[in-house]
Structures are given as C-alpha cells and as structure tokens.
Amino acid sequence: MKKIILFIIVFSSTLSFAQITLYHNVYVNSEDQSKFEMVERDYMSKLAQKAVNDGKFIYWALEKVLQPSNAMGGEVNHQLVGNWYQFVIVYSDMKAYLNAGPWWSDTDNLLGVPQELLSYKVKQGGMYLWHIKDSAMVTGAKFSAYNFGFSEEPSKFIESQKEYKVFFENMNKTNQNGRAGWVSGVRVSPKNFGEHNVMTWDGFLTLEDAMNHWTNWVESKKEYKKIHLPNGFDLKMIAAKIAETSAPSN
C-alpha cells in the first residue's frame, strides 16, 4: 500500500453535451477508510467547492463502491477487507478539463492545514475520461448505478439510448422507483479497442432503490443487440456518495 500526499482528480445536476467527466479510482483498506473519508469530506471538499465557485469545474464528488462485493481490479471490494472509491469531476468541456490546474494543492493557505497532515494510505487505480452525450437530470441522487460495456458502434449505442431518456425523464419528475437522474456517455481515454467505451449512469435516492433496480432488471441478448451492445453491460457497479460539492456560491 502506497502512502501518498493528497492528490485528487476525478457528476452533476446540470449537464450539457460537451461535458467531460473524469473518474479517478483508488483502493482503501478497511482500517484506513475512516481517515480517508474524513480528510476528503471535511477538508478537500472545501478546496473542490472553491474550484467550483471559481469556475474551474462544475462538480466534484467522492463515491464509495458498494457493489459488486468481489474481486475488482486485483483487489477484494468488501467492507471487511477494503473498497474501491472514485473521485468524480465534471468539467464544462475539454478546454476546462485541460486548464483546471492543481486546484487541490493549496491546503496551507486555504485550509490552514499543512498538506502532510492530510496524507493517507491508498492504492492508486486508473483514471478514466468520459464524454457525456445525453442526460435526464434532477437533483438529490445519493447513490449511483453504473453500467459499462463495449460497442463497435458507440454512436449507434448513444442514439439507441434516446428512447430510454424519455422514459427516465418521466420517472425522474416524481422520483418514481427512487430515480434521480440518468446519463449516457462514451469514453475518451484510455481508448483501446475491446475495452469499455460506452456507459450509462442511473442516480437513486436510496441504496434500496439502487439495489431494486438490479433486482428488477431483466437482461436479454435481443435487447442488447438492439442497443448495439452484443456482450451487454459486462461491468455494473453501485456506489454511495460520501462527499460532493454544491452549486457555485458566487
């Protein structure tokens, strides 16, 4: 396990189709999770909020992956052992992503806390850059259900999602089945043939709502073929929001 000084990079209530979302994954052992979450929630979220207020990006969050509770990325994702977390940052466009700079670094002046006191133990995972293509958003989601797959025709996959968008928009209006948002996107980086290159995100109000979504989901080859995803969504995750920013205060 590698000890690092806080380095944060890595979703949202108002989306435009130029938006870029960065996910930065880290693995935290069970015994280190309390400090890790405290540092991010009580300290680093303040730096993220300042960056939002300054227009560097639109949204920042830390999510804890709850499901699946098995081996992922070479580590066991289970509360008794450790969990994957992901930092989530939403930028207005690619230019904003490229120009954001090291917004997390000025802890001494902005927080009054030396950066070395905010260090913790994590194992670095990957960083994944996604382009948001469509959305049906409302506020209030506290749990995220992610679906990842590979399509040889990602543009056709995105086009196929339009009918689902209308369906989810209607559900979001009354939070039917606990729904609180939906997004579709394509991966920008890393960009390797055969790896996950399309995704959808479903927001939910409670963990029970998110788990019921899985329970009631009937998958079929026919439906996957219809959306140009022959092997289906072969990775699904449910994550809880640990900390997040709010709308700009200025």
Report each predicted region and the residues it spans.
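Short S/T/G/P-rich N-terminal loop/turn motif that feeds into the first structured element of a domain
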Residues: 18-250
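Sec-dependent N-terminal signal peptides
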Residues: 3-16
